[in-house]
Amino acid sequence: MSCQAFTSADTFIPLNSDASATLPLIMHHSAAECLPVSNHATNVMSTATGLHYSVPSCHYGNQPSTYGVMAGSLTLVFYKFPDHTLSHGFPPIHQPLLAEDPTAADFKQELRRKSKLVEEPIDMDSPEIRELEKFANEFKVRRIKLGYTQTNVGEALAAVHGSEFSQTTICRFENLQLSFKNACKLKAILSKWLEEAEQVGALYNEKVGANERKRKRRTTISIAAKDALERHFGEQNKPSSQEIMRMAEELNLEKEVVRVWFCNRRQREKRVKTSLNQSLFSISKEHLECR
């Protein structure tokens, strides 16, 4: 229970309507004779300003004073306290007792945590760095082996992932000039692209190799078989399909081989005849000029 001491004469005016008809009550007392200040009295004052009670007086230490509750009675009296007594007020509420929005508190904690979060330096001898360097070198070698340029790779990735990929991006990755975070992201993309490019290259090489094997495949015809084919050509230079099949069975050759031989033989015969005709025409022309 706290007390408010009055060191000077204080004037108390009752709040009833008859206050103007009575003289103000003067109270003189020392610091030892102080009035108790309670929250209950303050609350009563703020809620019952419309009530009017008489002002009973009592004596304390042979000095007249006025109290809110008279001894032996429950009659309440409301006063107008001096201004200097109201200026003291109550102590401020302690900050931790104030309620705070949990959402705002969580946001502040998260913001504080992120502001204190500092990226740890990367160890250049770590396994991740060595693995990244190894992949960059392997990627460059395999890219060149497949026949792709840095521009080809950048355009292929830009068509799928966006315009942030270019020849400069691939060049910086192969030279390890990107940040570790960006290089790790690009490594996954380039690894997938390289796998797909090698699959396409394998299919292309297989197809080209098969075509080359077909073109380079040659059949050796024996001298006896050539003589027999020459005799048949002298008899019939354009044999039918049945005759070609019969000759192939007799000479132990494939039907396609016999057919191609007759085609080539007719072309050679045509070139020989053309050459002979040109030679005869030239000789005749020279003979006429000499005359």
From Swiss-Prot:
<keyword id="KW-0010">Activator</keyword>
<dbReference type="GO" id="GO:0006357">
    <property type="term" value="P:regulation of transcription by RNA polymerase II"/>
</dbReference>
<dbReference type="InterPro" id="IPR017970">
    <property type="entry name" value="Homeobox_CS"/>
</dbReference>
<dbReference type="GO" id="GO:0000981">
    <property type="term" value="F:DNA-binding transcription factor activity, RNA polymerase II-specific"/>
</dbReference>
<keyword id="KW-0371">Homeobox</keyword>
<comment type="function">
    <text>Transcription factor involved in the specification of the lactotrope, somatotrope, and thyrotrope phenotypes in the developing anterior pituitary. Activates growth hormone and prolactin genes. Specifically binds to the consensus sequence 5'-TAAAT-3'.</text>
</comment>
<dbReference type="InterPro" id="IPR010982">
    <property type="entry name" value="Lambda_DNA-bd_dom_sf"/>
</dbReference>
<dbReference type="GO" id="GO:0005634">
    <property type="term" value="C:nucleus"/>
</dbReference>
<feature type="DNA-binding region" description="Homeobox">
    <location>
        <begin position="214"/>
        <end position="273"/>
    </location>
</feature>
<dbReference type="GO" id="GO:0000978">
    <property type="term" value="F:RNA polymerase II cis-regulatory region sequence-specific DNA binding"/>
</dbReference>
<protein>
    <recommendedName>
        <fullName>Pituitary-specific positive transcription factor 1</fullName>
    </recommendedName>
</protein>
<dbReference type="InterPro" id="IPR000327">
    <property type="entry name" value="POU_dom"/>
</dbReference>
<dbReference type="InterPro" id="IPR001356">
    <property type="entry name" value="HD"/>
</dbReference>
<keyword id="KW-0238">DNA-binding</keyword>
<dbReference type="Pfam" id="PF00157">
    <property type="entry name" value="Pou"/>
</dbReference>
<dbReference type="InterPro" id="IPR013847">
    <property type="entry name" value="POU"/>
</dbReference>
<keyword id="KW-0539">Nucleus</keyword>
<dbReference type="InterPro" id="IPR009057">
    <property type="entry name" value="Homeodomain-like_sf"/>
</dbReference>
<dbReference type="InterPro" id="IPR050255">
    <property type="entry name" value="POU_domain_TF"/>
</dbReference>
<keyword id="KW-0805">Transcription regulation</keyword>
<comment type="subunit">
    <text>Interacts with PITX1. Interacts with LHX3. Interacts with ELK1.</text>
</comment>
<feature type="domain" description="POU-specific">
    <location>
        <begin position="124"/>
        <end position="198"/>
    </location>
</feature>
<comment type="similarity">
    <text>Belongs to the POU transcription factor family. Class-1 subfamily.</text>
</comment>
<feature type="short sequence motif" description="9aaTAD">
    <location>
        <begin position="5"/>
        <end position="13"/>
    </location>
</feature>
<dbReference type="Pfam" id="PF00046">
    <property type="entry name" value="Homeodomain"/>
</dbReference>
<keyword id="KW-0804">Transcription</keyword>
<dbReference type="GO" id="GO:0045944">
    <property type="term" value="P:positive regulation of transcription by RNA polymerase II"/>
</dbReference>
